[in-house]
């Protein structure tokens, strides 16, 4: 009986795939674009992105086509992350997830009800290919925490970059459990790959991203949550009938922070946050840098720490400003002039009632400066001490 049910479920899944393919084929996708252009026309999907060059934010934005990013977990944060990277024109996107789309996922962004039952990576790939056919999308539908699949995951992020045989440029962790985070952490420490860890709290009102550079900053095992440190099984913490809360707003904000910092890292602009948190209750955004733990349990992390400490530190060269005869500003576009401290200040004359519009009268008129000075001089000259007055009275 159970075997027959499994067969029926497999048939239903195949029919859903065929139906999805039929719907996709009816939609007309745009043709591929060989080269990014800054031309401002309605038919150019990259004109707004290339405008970052004209505004001196990014140099050579089209370099993004040479980058490969792996997104692990295509859920509330991961699906939006993949969507943003696709719209930004990333060169290659590698998706990892083994879950299926459910109607319970509809409170999040990206997925649609007609995709229920499809694998998340498959549903995401079809939508993303339609959004931007220029992006090369690769999908992997398996659990990376098993022994065999971990080796497959390790090989993929090491050899499936934009150029085959090269590692990916960045790994983005968008998973919702500590076991998967530890697997990503172990893989990136072993292969010395930079990666971002992200997450949203179970009450859905806070999130964070963390940029991990092996050896330079703390890895996920350097300062693990209590659940990981105590080797507690996460499944035992979940009560029956109780699930984590989820808000598309918090998911979208966290994904936005994640992709924003990923772009800054990939295209070398701005400052990449080592850790950025978000608390929705009071709109609090803490930033910090976590240093690696010299007693970390991950041996590869300890190895990366030694390698980082052995690197020669960059020498800071201070420029000798005094030796330059050229002015600091060759041109003075705004006509700014420096005024000496001892130069008299020209104060504007106070307004008079006669100078205002007819029918209006000033509530207070400042006295003329000459009269004020004369009154002050007269007051000073009339002042006599008490001793002098008593001496004058005695002499009378």
From Swiss-Prot:
Question: Does the record's keyword annotation contain Nucleotide-binding?
Answer: yes
What top-level branch of life does the organism fall under? Answer: Eukaryota
What processes does the entry annotate via GO biological process terms? protein ufmylation
Which GO MF terms does the UniProt record name? ATP binding; metal ion binding; UFM1 activating enzyme activity
List the GO terms this entry assigns under cellular component, sorted alphabetically. Answer: cytosol
Return the InterPro entries for the record.
D-isomer_DH_CS1, ThiF/MoeB/HesA, ThiF_NAD_FAD-bd, Ubiquitin-activating_enz
Function, in words: E1-like enzyme which activates UFM1.
Write out the similarity annotation.
Belongs to the ubiquitin-activating E1 family. UBA5 subfamily.
By its UniProt entry, which PANTHER family does this protein fall under? UBIQUITIN-ACTIVATING ENZYME E1 (PTHR10953), UBIQUITIN-LIKE MODIFIER-ACTIVATING ENZYME 5 (PTHR10953:SF9)
Protein's name according to its UniProt entry: Ubiquitin-like modifier-activating enzyme 5
Organism of provenance: Drosophila ananassae
- What is this organism's lineage? Eukaryota, Metazoa, Ecdysozoa, Arthropoda, Hexapoda
């Amino acid at each position: 009986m159970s075997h027959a049910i499994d067969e029926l479920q497999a048939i239903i899944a195949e029919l859903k795939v065929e139906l999805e393919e039929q719907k996709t084929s009816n939609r007309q996708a745009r043709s591929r674009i060989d080269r990014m252009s800054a031309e401002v026309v309605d038919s150019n999907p990259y004109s707004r992105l290339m405008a970052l060059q004209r505004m001196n934010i990014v140099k050579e934005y089209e370099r993004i086509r040479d980058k490969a990013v792996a997104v692990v977990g295509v859920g509330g944060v991961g699906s939006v992350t993949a969507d943003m990277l696709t719209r930004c024109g990333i060169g290659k996107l590698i998706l990892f997830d083994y879950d299926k789309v459910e109607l319970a996922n509809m409170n999040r962004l990206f997925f649609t009800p007609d995709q229920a039952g499809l694998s998340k990576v498959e549903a995401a790939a079809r939508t993303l290919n339609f959004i931007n056919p220029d992006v090369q999308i690769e999908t992997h539908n398996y659990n990376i925490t098993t022994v065999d699949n971990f080796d497959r995951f390790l090989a993929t992020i090491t050899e499936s970059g934009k150029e085959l045989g090269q590692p990916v440029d960045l790994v983005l962790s968008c998973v919702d459990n500590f076991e998967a985070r530890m697997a990503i952490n172990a893989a990136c420490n072993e292969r010395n790959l930079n990666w971002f860890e992200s997450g949203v709290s179970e009450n859905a009102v806070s999130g964070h991203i963390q940029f991990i550079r092996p050896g330079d900053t703390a890895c996920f095992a350097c300062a693990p949550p209590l659940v990981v440190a105590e080797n507690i099984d996460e499944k035992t913490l979940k009560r029956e009938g109780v699930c984590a809360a989820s808000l598309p707003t918090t998911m979208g904000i966290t994904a936005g922070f994640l992709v924003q910092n990923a772009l800054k890292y990939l295209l070398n602009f701005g400052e990449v946050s080592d850790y950025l948190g978000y608390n929705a209750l009071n709109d609090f955004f803490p930033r910090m840098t976590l240093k690696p733990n010299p007693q970390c349990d991950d041996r590869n992390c300890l190895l990366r720490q030694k390698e980082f400490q052995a690197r020669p530190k960059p020498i800071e060269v201070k420029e000798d400003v005094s030796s330059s005869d050229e002015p600091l500003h060759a041109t003075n576009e705004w006509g700014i002039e420096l005024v000496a401290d001892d130069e008299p200040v020209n104060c504007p004359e106070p307004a008079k009632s006669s100078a205002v519009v007819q029918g209006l009268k000033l509530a207070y008129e400042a006295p003329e400066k000459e009269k004020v000075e004369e009154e002050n001089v007269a007051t000073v000259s009339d002042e006599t001490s008490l001793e002098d007055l008593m001496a004058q009275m005695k002499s009378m």
